[in-house]
């Protein structure tokens, strides 16, 4: 049987994979099979962590808002604050509220005080 000389296609494919893994350490950037495995693993981790990042940021925003709210009012919590925001139909998302809590805490206190006053006034009047 005659020998078949491989063309440039396989070499081009391997070069493309090697460029992806050029920043990896050791055999993960040198051996083709290992590079392929590490590329799959890296892409899986990236996909998983994109979702995890959204969850972590939401958790961070909620923690910051809750800390700022509890600092001012003793018996007032994050869940009551968000519930009162929805009742008042104020469309402020958690990201914006967390930024306000860090940069301009007095503004957040003003918002929460207005909401507390209005909700308590509505509850007292019926």
Curated annotation (Swiss-Prot):
Q: Name one GO cellular component term.
A: ribonucleoprotein complex
GO BP term, example: translation
Where it mainly occurs, coarsely classed, is plastid
| Keyword Nucleotidyltransferase attributed | no
Name the Gene3D superfamilies for this protein: 6.10.160.10, Ribosomal protein L20
Q: Which domain of life is it from?
A: Eukaryota
What the record says about family reads:
Belongs to the bacterial ribosomal protein bL20 family.
* Protein name per its UniProtKB record: Large ribosomal subunit protein bL20c
From what organism does this protein derive? Helianthus annuus (Common sunflower)
Q: What is the lineage of its organism?
A: Eukaryota, Viridiplantae, Streptophyta, Embryophyta, Tracheophyta
